[in-house]
Amino acid sequence: MFDLGTSKFRGNILIILKKIGIVLSSSALSFGMYASVTSASITENGQPEKVQIQVASTDTVFSKNELIKKFREAFPKRFDFLTDSDFQVGGSHFFPDDKQLRHDLSFTKTINGKRLYGNVGFVGEDLEIEHFYYQPSNTAEALFPAKTSKEQARKIAVDFVKELDGGKEYQLESDPFNYFPKQILTEPVRYSFSFARTENQVTILDQRIEVSVLGNGEIITLYRNPSNSDTSTFDDVKKIKDKNEMLEKVKGNLSAELRYQIDYDYQTDDRQVQLVYQPTTKLRGVHASTGKWLTANGYSADFPVKTKIEKITANPLPPKQDGITLEDAKKIAEQFLEINSDKVKLSIQSVDEIENYNGQAVISIQYMYNFASSGHGTTMEINKNTGEIIQYNDLKSQIAEQIGEKPYIENTLSNREALAKAVKYAKEWAPSYLHNFAMPIDEAYIEERQGIYHFTFPRIENDIVVMGDQISVGVAADGSLNSFNVNYQEIEQWPSTDKVVSEEDAKSALKKALSLKLTYMKQEKNEDKNHYDLVYLPEFYEEPFSYLNANTGEWNSSFQGGKLAVISHPWAEKELNYFISAKVLDIKDGKDFNGDASVSKGEAIKIIMNSLTYIYDGRYYSGNENKNQTFDNIDPKHPLYQAIERAVEMDIIQPDGQTFDVDSPIKREELAVWYIRVLGLEQAAKDSSIYKIDFADANKVRTEYIGHVALANSMGLLKTEQNHFNPDREATYAELAVSIIRLAHKMTEKAPGLGY
């Protein structure tokens, strides 16, 4: 739905964020400090998407013309250039837990040789738009510097939401956090805005609208949670307890818990471990009317008690097997994936040995269930050295539901029975890991519709919980294994607790940063599924993804969002600052940066590659990245290895020796050569005899590069100054920034959407 480039990382991040979007997109981002380990694992271990139940075309309620009419009403005059024949109707479907019928409509058209595309999803009898995506045929005006400013885009989004839901009140929230590491310059500028629906001027947690506006002013994405506003009921806002009173109540019960936090840099594959303090994890909020504590199990008059840490097994257990082959792994997978249905056929697509992002040698089995004219598949991973399961998700219940073979299942296991099953599966399929993990310290998450229990067994080191590392086990209503995921990162040395601030000091810092946000939210344990409770949600600090550093007692941010350096320059200020905001240029301190300083060849190629392509150096992506070594002095451990090897692959750098001088300054003439090669015009530039350059310093241009310089100048990439090209002058950061942006525009003119 979103154009996020070709990177596997960006796709995976989007999936994760989609699953936890309700929490992350709310203004209570720092509520994540209170989120339990259980919640984190459930959202991140890749649980399957919702099952779509297809509806026969004969049962479709709305015609194509009705859908087109509703679409045009939502976007008056915007798509008048489309004819009815440009639209196509997709299938209708519903979800098992939401019987509202959904209809899909798409459109495509070619204008001046360029194709545009879009789709829209409607839900319910009123054909409420649930999602919308539009890919225009021309995005030139959306490239930096964009035609539409952020302020103008904000007004466009606000006006659109007002028209979309005239009778409902939506509140524009603060700018959403930039989750992605960088954006290449051939991608158009996008502005994202988040709106929360309100009732009695209080935001509703699960009623949101997300809108993206392109840099040319066009609305390109919309997503909103479908609502049953006609049947929803809400707590009386006049009956809530005083906010300050509740705040003091929370502070009085607050405790600080020491945790290990692993920060993983996917680009370098480095892992840094630090000690952090986190508040009581079992508390979700406080009911605003009764003052009861909200936990995973509902409301309680008693504050949730901290669970004592208990190892699954005190001593190491032997691995399940002493290494397995690809054929062994395939047999294990077939045992897990076997499905008892004549309507479904299992197909093993591939069995490969890979190294996962935790550095483990695993065997990856890609498989597909084929049924009717559809199919559904995913990947299973098995540890090559131990034969133990690393990742498994059962799709069989979903498949059965799609083909109508499995009825609604009531929960038939008690929590205790399901936990015993989960421990049994952990001992059977990951025995060699278990001495590093503890019994669940948080309540199980229960998918009540299917009766599935999800348990999280946290990793323990030095009697301290390791945040993010866990074994996640899902147990189905019939006691079968529904999901299994082991996240275990190899860490050589764990920080000592000798120099951490005291628990009391940490608790004081948490209390100082704590605030409460009044929110309407549904409580899963409530029998009335349409009722919204008023809840005070805890918030810490103002920075999203913030944490309390246990060694300094200070607040830090995992991503340092909103704290980018800002620099000044007489003629390239906006370009340089855009490079910084797009994470193309890494500047720690704007005061020390000199935009007129010379750029080395190594730094120049790094900036060019970061501007035009997505490069990931980490182990998890190494299967898709370069493994060759072109230059003796640039081995795979060199920080510029991927950038230089990618430049060689793209013929930007054409090796003429055994080494590459990363430290020597890049001259303007050399920069012109690189740019022309980026555009694929190397052959056109090589015949220097057909080019005439009349610069005052034309004699300083090397003969073999006359064509490159002539083209770079005529295309406006590198311009003359007082009729001097200055081919042997060292290029500066400012020149590089301005000229690369021009290059990005030329690239999109040549091939819209081009990105390496």
What feature does the model see in each segment?
Residues 53-91, 145-184, 233-266, 314-352, ...:
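Short, non-transmembrane alpha-helical segments in secretory-pathway proteins
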Residues 196, 207-212, 222-225, 458, ...:
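A structural feature that tracks compact, well-ordered secondary-structure segments
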Residues 75-124, 172-215, 260-292, 339-385, ...:
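Exposed beta-strand-loop-beta-strand "reactive/processing" segments of non-cytosolic proteins
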Residues 33-38, 555-573, 586-602, 609-641, ...:
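Feature responds to low-complexity, polar/acidic, surface-exposed segments characteristic
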Residues 53-61, 140-148, 235, 315-323, ...:
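Second-shell loop/turn segments in exported
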Residues 110-155, 162-170, 203-241, 282-310, ...:
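Extended intrinsically disordered, low-complexity coil regions enriched in Ser, Thr, Gly, Ala
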Residues 2-5, 9-41:
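Sec-dependent N-terminal signal peptides of Gram-positive bacterial secreted proteins and lipoproteins
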